[in-house]
Amino acid sequence: TTLRKDAEIIDCKGACLAPGLVDMRAQSADPGAEHLEDLHTLLHAAASGGISTIVALPNAKPVIDDASMIDSLSLRATRIGGARLRLYGAATRKLRGKAMAELGLMAEAGAVGFSNGNRCIMDSLVMRRLLAYSAMLDRPFIQHCEDHDLTAAGEMNEGETSTRLGLIGAPAEAEAIIIDRDLHLIRMTGARYH
């Protein structure tokens, strides 16, 4: 193609050119801890860094576990501008890992998937049900793969360094165990999973 003579030329040497990036696991302090970071700051900081869309995990305080919160945050984000905001609905009420949240209502309100944030679903029956509902609603499930029974006391990754320093290590198998279990459940349910 030919450029117009009056076209602005931007020197991009040393720069990284890419389409807008998507942050699939954003942490938001809003609602609940806006003194740390509010939605305006989050969305504009993301846009300034080349992030065009962020998908916020539900582990705010209060937890994003009902449709009205999805509606409210989505509306506020539209008014604020900056990066686009998408939301995961909490998989379980208050992220406790036991009682399922209202997945269907959150999906209708615009939740793009479901997650328990940085807390793994340890109960296999609850996880099976969550995956079945996620599949039925055509939404992915985003899991934090970590067997908390194996990592609760861990101060760092288990290995030579943790042994040498005398620190309690968290074994890598804590992640593999959850992934293995969840792969079996995904085969049963046909759910999409990340």
Segment roles from a protein language model:
Residues 24-37, 58-60, 86-99, 166-173:
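Active-site mouth loops of central-metabolism enzymes
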